[in-house]
């Protein structure tokens, strides 16, 4: 059950929404995870601790950093809509990638799919995204040293419209 505890803690850290649900209804943890009584009590205590909000912020900052560093004009062009589209992206892809170019490339592909599906974004988004996505893709190709190249699955983006 330790694995379930660890997964629950990771999920809670990655999802402020899940933390809020658990604060209001701690039984959510028992419904989603196989926990001992002790593990459940610890997680409920962690979620209720004021520091948990900071843990969630740090997690999200780490997910946002590759985007802010690699596609800054796209982020700026999204303006106030950045928060909503990034939150949707994180919901669609709950597990980040520590390779900044892979994470940025995946977000670019996510946003490209939303644009292709008719998503409504400021006019500056499409040209900024096209320019920066090409730069990220080239940097990603140059940075990979694995025998098997990174190939994102197109099915990952089918439901992102």
Residue ranges and their predicted role:
Residues 4, 48-49, 60:
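RNase III-family endoribonuclease catalytic core
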Residues 88-161:
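Hydrophobic packing positions characteristic
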Residues 33-56, 100-119:
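Membrane-interacting alpha-helical segments
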Residues 1-41:
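Membrane topogenic helices and adjacent juxtamembrane segments
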Residues 56-94:
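Amphipathic alpha-helical packing elements
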Residues 4-8, 25-28, 66-73, 85-89, ...:
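A general alpha-helix detector
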Residues 28-29, 49-50, 91-96:
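A short structural micro-motif
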Residues 18-23, 59-68, 99-101:
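Short acidic alpha-helix initiation/capping motifs at coil-to-helix transition points
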């Amino acid at each position: 059950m330790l694995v379930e505890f660890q997964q629950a803690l990771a999920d809670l850290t990655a999802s402020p929404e899940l933390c809020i649900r658990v604060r209001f209804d701690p039984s959510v943890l028992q419904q989603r995870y196989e926990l001992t009584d002790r593990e459940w009590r610890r997680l409920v205590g962690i979620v209720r601790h004021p520091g948990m909000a900071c843990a969630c912020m740090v997690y999200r900052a780490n997910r946002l950093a590759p985007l802010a560093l690699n596609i800054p004009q796209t982020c700026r062009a999204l303006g106030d809509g950045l928060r909503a589209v990034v939150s949707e992206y994180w919901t669609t892809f709950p597990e980040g990638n520590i390779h900044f170019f892979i994470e940025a490339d995946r977000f670019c592909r996510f946003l490209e799919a939303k644009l292709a599906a008719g998503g409504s974004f400021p006019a500056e988004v499409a040209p900024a995204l096209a320019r920066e996505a090409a730069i990220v893709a080239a940097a990603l190709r140059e940075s990979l040293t694995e025998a098997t190249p990174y190939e994102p699955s197109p099915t990952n983006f089918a439901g992102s419209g």
